[in-house]
Each structure stands twice: as C-alpha cells, then as structure tokens.
Curated annotation (Swiss-Prot):
UniProt cross-references to SUPFAM superfamilies, sorted A to Z: L9 N-domain-like, Ribosomal protein L9 C-domain
One Pfam family recorded for the sequence: Ribosomal_L9_C
Stretches that traverse the bilayer: none
PANTHER family assigned: 50S RIBOSOMAL PROTEIN L9
Name of this chain's protein: Large ribosomal subunit protein bL9
Organism of derivation: Nitrosococcus oceani (strain ATCC 19707 / BCRC 17464 / JCM 30415 / NCIMB 11848 / C-107)
UniProt similarity note: Belongs to the bacterial ribosomal protein bL9 family.
Function: Binds to the 23S rRNA.
GO biological process terms on file: translation
C-alpha cells in the first residue's frame, strides 16, 4: 500500500514522501496516528494544498525540540535519589519514567518515551550518560546521577 507521509517517520521517510508500506502498518499505525494518508489522487491534491502548513508545523516541532535541547544543555545533569544497599545496588531500579519525572521537576518537560535506556533500567548508584531523543533529528545528552539512600 502506498501512503503519503504527513510528518517524518524514522526509518521510513520525511514529510511529503510517497512510500510503499505493508497494508497492516498503514491501516493500524500510520493512518490512525495521523502520520500518513493513503496515496489516492484526492489525498495527493489535498496534501499539496496543505503542504506549506504541514512544513510550518514540522518546523515548529523542531524548534521546540531545539529549545528543549538547549534547556537540557543548560541543566547539565540531574540527580535522582534512590534507596540502595551498602554495596551501591539499588532496591528496585531507576527507569525512563523516573528520569523523565526528575527532568520535569528540574524544569524541562520531557516524556518517558523520549528517554532511551539502551542497557535497561539503572540498577546501580553512579553517573550515567544518556541521550534524550526529543525529535527524530534532535538528540540531547544528559548526565544522570543516581545517589543512594541507605535504609
């Protein structure tokens, strides 16, 4: 099935690209999420009339992501206290939601889906360098310091 992308989709294409995808992917994900429309003549004409508006919206999203990246750079690091044993092993773990919550409390609005933990949840006390994926084209590094609170 051919679709016209209404925004940039990772590993697929950018705004306005006409791409061939599996029918289920288009019907169950891209179209319901508003990321694409099926490539019919009517939709192509409608897309061409809205292209400038969609490009402006995409540019605004990138601008917001860049401002957020600058705010993260100004912040530098975030400290998350967690209960830990004497060896530095945490009771539980620090996950993406905990990191997003700590960043939001520090003044930078981040969703948990934007925090990527390549090696899984943090289970030890220490400093970790993470990358926050704010937009498909904008990533921001952040240092997360997990401190232990002994019981």
């Amino acid at each position: 099935m051919e679709v016209i992308l209404l925004e940039q989709v990772v590993n697929l294409g950018k705004l306005g690209d006409k791409v061939a995808v599996k029918s289920g992917y288009a019907r169950n994900y891209l179209i319901p999420q508003g990321r694409a429309v099926s490539a019919t003549k009517e939709n192509e004409a409608h897309f061409e009339s809205r292209k400038a508006e969609l490009e402006k919206a995409a540019g605004d999203k990138v601008a917001v992501a860049e401002r957020c990246k600058q705010a993260l750079a100004d912040l530098g690091s975030v400290t998350i206290p967690a209960k830990a044993g004497t060896e530095g092993k945490l009771f539980g773990s620090v996950g993406a939601a905990d990191i997003a919550e700590a960043l939001t409390k520090a003044g930078v609005e981040i969703g948990k889906k934007e925090v990527r933990l390549p090696e899984g949840a943090l289970r030890q006390v220490g400093e970790y360098e993470l990358v926050i994926h704010l937009h498909p084209t904008v990533e921001a590094p952040i240092k997360v310091v997990v401190t232990g609170e002994e019981e």
